[in-house]
Regions:
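Short, low-structural-confidence N-terminal segments
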Residues: 1-113, 253, 260-266, 275, ...
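N-terminal short leaders/motifs
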Residues: 12-34, 213-239
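Alpha-helical transmembrane segments of integral membrane proteins
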Residues: 32-36, 116, 120, 185
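N-terminal targeting/tethering segments
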Residues: 61-178, 182
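FKBP-type peptidyl-prolyl cis-trans isomerase
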Residues: 69-97, 136, 192-196, 226-231, ...
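Sec-exported extracytoplasmic/periplasmic mature domains
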Residues: 92-99, 123-142, 148, 153-164, ...
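Proteostasis/folding factors centered on peptidyl-prolyl cis-trans isomerases
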Residues: 169-198, 252-297
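Peptidyl-prolyl cis-trans isomerase
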Residues: 216-257, 285-292
Length: 332
């Protein structure tokens, strides 16, 4: 029939076109094969990366650099992803310090125990920092470059004198293995956590307000008396003594506040630069290079308590297996 003849004719022409344009058909096949190869390669690479990061927990410099490019999570906290790179950054600094400064063999029994310790510390720290950043965004809390600069500037003062920024950067690289940009990132995250901890801790703020009222109603109450009065009202407060320390001592800003005082004088409340609470200091003694002081501390507790509550409510999910140790920040 005419239809059968037409079909045969089309088949013959199609075959002719294939012989007439062989390069076109070959090119299409090459493109198709190339796409298949690329997809398979990507899948294989993804499986290898997944295996190395999660089951194997590879902490090498290569995978640390890789996680800075690929934003893969190591955990989630209250719906926020904890970056694997932040965990590895903290862990690498601790490992570098143990190897270079403490000369610890990480393959020894003691070294393996230390690794478990700093792994938990690094993971809990990364989780806490991420949760702090989440709250900071909600409350509009920001940290400026100047605040980071001020922290670094205060660290340039040493017992033997003030060092240069270059010497400080070289020391950070040698001791912890961090570049200046990496260390600035760590400082920025710690400042965010501190700012959030102070912002949300209504208990500590109430204790501070109560202490200020007690101070105003009495003539120079001793720190011991003030601490007991706060404790009797149900507030958390503790006292302590520094002993003789150099005036360049890095202790959360307590020495620097004590330097402003006369003997036996008590400061007003201030926030420690380590973000662990509100302090009063009383100067005990001072020389040209050293001083000693007593202090009263009202600790911050609500941030860590919120993390504990999240853990209890299964709102913290960890994607790698890390043992619980005494270093844990999040008490479970």
């Amino acid at each position: 029939t005419n239809e059968t003849v037409a079909e045969h004719r089309e088949q013959i022409l199609a075959g002719g076109r294939r012989f007439k344009y062989p390069r076109q058909y070959a090119r299409h096949k090459l493109v198709f094969n190339a796409i298949i190869i690329i997809i398979v390669t990507i899948l294989i690479a993804a499986v290898i990366i997944w295996w190395q990061l999660y089951p194997a927990q590879n902490t090498s410099t290569f995978f640390y650099r890789l996680t800075r490019i690929l934003p893969v999570p190591v955990a989630t906290v209250d719906g926020a992803q904890v970056k694997y790179s932040d965990y590895l950054m903290s862990l690498s600094g601790s490992q570098h310090y143990l190897q270079q400064s403490e000369r610890l063999n990480l393959d020894s029994d003691d070294g393996k125990r230390q690794i478990e310790f700093i792994k938990r510390q690094a993971l809990d720290g990364a989780i806490a920092d991420t949760y702090a950043e989440k709250i900071a965004k909600e409350k509009g809390i920001t940290i400026t470059d100047k605040q980071v600069d001020d922290v670094i500037a205060s660290s340039l003062n040493t017992v033997s004198g003030r060092i240069s920024q270059d010497v400080y950067d070289d020391s950070t690289l040698s001791t912890l293995g961090y570049t200046s940009d990496e260390y600035r990132h760590i400082i920025q995250r710690s400042l965010v956590r501190q700012a959030v901890a102070y912002e949300i801790d209504t208990k500590a703020a109430s204790a501070k307000k109560a202490a200020e009222s007690l101070i105003a109603g009495a003539k120079n109450p001793s720190l011991i008396t003030l601490s007991k009065q706060l404790q009797s009202k149900g507030y958390d407060a503790s006292i302590g003594a520094s002993g003789l320390v150099p005036k360049t001592n890095h202790d959360g800003g307590l020495t620097q506040e004590a330097m402003k005082l006369k003997k036996s004088q008590v400061s007003g409340f201030f926030r420690s630069t380590t973000g662990d609470g509100y302090y009063l200091v009383q100067l005990v003694n001072s020389t040209d290079t050293q001083l000693s002081y007593n202090f009263l501390r009202i600790p911050l507790t609500m941030f860590n308590q919120q993390l504990k509550t999240l853990a209890e409510n299964k709102k913290i999910q960890e994607y790698i297996s890390v043992k619980q140790t005494s270093s844990e920040i999040i008490r479970r």
